[in-house]
């Protein structure tokens, strides 16, 4: 099964706040060691998805690390992006929702804006196996 974790301030971000840096890095390292698949955050008023990254912001050699989603698109005033950090793969400046499906061995996502358009979507394998 997939391991999903949620907290408020993202470790990585293209936004004004530029992520939480050193404050969350030790927790990210722990989650990575425990096989976390997804980290959901808000705080920034936009949608952003990253490649799987280690606590230092690098893609792991084996591709196995948590993938962060920043989803602060629930209705507050949106604000723009700064220069996207390394490995930011999708950015949407529209109100909307993130739909996740956690299934045996994989997860999928769709970011749907308020007009009903799918603005980002994908599928990935889970890191952990559960009996």
Spans of features found by a protein language model:
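Acidic, His/Gly-rich catalytic cores of divalent-metal-dependent hydrolytic chemistry
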Residues: 115-130
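Long, structured stretches of catalytic cores involved in phosphate-ester chemistry, encompassing
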Residues: 1-119
């Amino acid at each position: 099964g997939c391991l999903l974790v949620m907290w408020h301030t993202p470790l990585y971000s293209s936004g004004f706040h530029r992520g939480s840096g050193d404050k969350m890095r030790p927790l990210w390292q722990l989650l990575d060691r425990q096989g976390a698949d997804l980290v959901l955050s808000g705080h920034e008023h936009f949608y952003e998805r990253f490649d799987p990254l280690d606590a230092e912001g690098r893609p792991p050699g084996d591709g196995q690390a948590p993938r962060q989603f920043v989803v602060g698109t629930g209705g507050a005033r949106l604000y723009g992006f700064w220069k996207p950090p390394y490995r930011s793969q999708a950015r949407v400046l529209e109100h909307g929702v993130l739909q996740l499906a956690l299934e045996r061995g994989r997860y999928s996502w769709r970011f749907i804006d308020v007009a009903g358009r799918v603005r980002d979507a994908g599928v990935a394998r889970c890191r952990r196996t559960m009996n």
